[in-house]
Amino acid sequence: MAKDIKFSADARSAMVRGVDILADTVKVTLGPKGRNVVLEKSFGSPLITNDGVTIAKEIELEDHFENMGAKLVSEVASKTNDIAGDGTTTATVLTQAIVREGIKNVTAGANPIGIRRGIEAAVATAVSALKETAIPVSNKEAIAQVAAVSSRSEKVGEYISEAMEKVGNDGVITIEESKGMETELDVVEGMQFDRGYLSQYMVTDSEKMVADLDNPYILITDKKISNIQEILPLLESILKTNRPLLIIADDVDGEALPTLVLNKIRGTFNVVAVKAPGFGDRRKAMLEDIAILTGGTVITEDLGLELKDATIEALGQASKVTVDKDSTVIVEGAGNPEAIANRVAVIKSQIESATSEFDKEKLQERLAKLSGGVAVIKVGAATETELKEMKLRIEDALNATRAAVEEGIVSGGGTAFVSVLDAVSGIELTGDEATGRNIVLRALEEPVRQIALNAGFEGSIVIDRLKNSEAGAGFNAATGEWVNMIEAGIIDPVKVTRSALQNAASVASLILTTEAVVANQPEPASPAPAMDPSMMGGMM
């Protein structure tokens, strides 16, 4: 395929046009008074959203060179979303500001490499200053504040803070669609896995079709149990204690399953059997998790253990187990807290080194199950369009809250960027590097300027007053008042703020140092096929 190539100023100006088109579309959503953008979908109703990364991903431009510029900014939004889960619109605004100021200077004859070094030095200083001013987030009220600011809903803030309190900061919090119109929170405490009872005759509550086991022993094995004789000595030992038994095995079939069911029906023995969760190596890891949580041992040939030799000491224990046809929940396992903490630490290190998103997600699920439970926020809305928009907002809020817990918070509304201006301007640089620093100084004002503009105020006036205000003061764009941002609950996570700046500077620097752009030439349209003369008989 033939290529179309542009060089130097032509290349950069074409890409900048794409940057501006995407950024101008996204930045109208910034702040509490940000507007919505309507996205056409190939089927179904249009999506109305103010989520920066969702909008950025939808933009595709006809001109190949402009499209490359737009896609680079979209990459900034996506990367910021991946790292911090929020701040995508801020990152887009910062990218446009750095590119716009940078291009002016490069066109005027400045060296792009020198400008890039200045930008990098300024951003490193700004990030250090942001981290120094960070306020730790630890209590429920602060978590609710962060979530409420991100989602623009105090109710959502309450749900997220309550969920994090119940399942821990590392716990799994999922967002699902509710069957009703109300948004609600559902918390499953303890370890849950998606395996139900192997026979409905094992239930203890025939109305709800669930099996409740109080203070049970738990047999954990990766073997298939087909012969009841293999576990008969163990069953006799448990029978003497008059406690129920949960069997977690690869499978229970042959004569073993009907024998267990028969004893359950007769009231001789309260037992429930379920299949082990997961597959392959993941199954082994999950069985080990269950064993550590309950203080038991996995009966496996890998450890040289046989079912026939298993004793009551090898069994796990829990205060309660609930099993329905689809899932099993183990509450308050009797495992050693130190062993559980060590296992959690191992899984955390595996998450950090995982390269696959799928592996990372599965490891986080295991971590949550060991840490204390799963919370589900069920989103309700009057229409499908509203439901989609609400889900996106809650996802952003959840990510922002986790980021805040991780690295702390700073004052919101873009004021944190303005607060580091003195630190950045204090860097001693010369020549083009000083120009790079000045570009960042101008860009750091842009989020506040855009938030004010979206709320119907003059951005330059807000910036001037902010620079002359005392530390902590800022402009509340929602009300048009000047307030102490932290006290007013207008806050941003440090991780979101610094990720937006770092990613914006990285991609903007690449655009400024671009000297050639290579694009595919559009293929000419195929000519229409000639009409067959034999089909023109009636026209002569």
From Swiss-Prot:
It is found in: Cytoplasm. GO terms for biological process: protein refolding. Its EC number is 5.6.1.7. SUPFAM superfamilies: GroEL apical domain-like, GroEL equatorial domain-like, GroEL-intermediate domain like. ATP binds at T29, L30, G31, P32, D86, G87, T88, T89, T90, G413, N476, A477, A478, D492. Its main location: cytoplasm. Keywords: ATP-binding, Chaperone, Cytoplasm, Isomerase, Nucleotide-binding. It comes from the Bacteria. GO terms for cellular component: cytoplasm. Pfam families: Cpn60_TCP1. GO terms for molecular function: ATP binding; ATP-dependent protein folding chaperone; isomerase activity; unfolded protein binding. It catalyses: ATP + H2O + a folded polypeptide = ADP + phosphate + an unfolded polypeptide. Forms a cylinder of 14 subunits composed of two heptameric rings stacked back-to-back. Interacts with the co-chaperonin GroES. Belongs to the chaperonin (HSP60) family. PANTHER family: 60 KDA HEAT SHOCK PROTEIN, MITOCHONDRIAL (PTHR45633). Together with its co-chaperonin GroES, plays an essential role in assisting protein folding. The GroEL-GroES system forms a nano-cage that allows encapsulation of the non-native substrate proteins and provides a physical environment optimized to promote and accelerate protein folding. This is Chaperonin GroEL. It comes from Streptococcus gordonii (strain Challis / ATCC 35105 / BCRC 15272 / CH1 / DL1 / V288). The lineage of its organism: Bacteria, Bacillati, Bacillota, Bacilli, Lactobacillales. The gene is groEL.
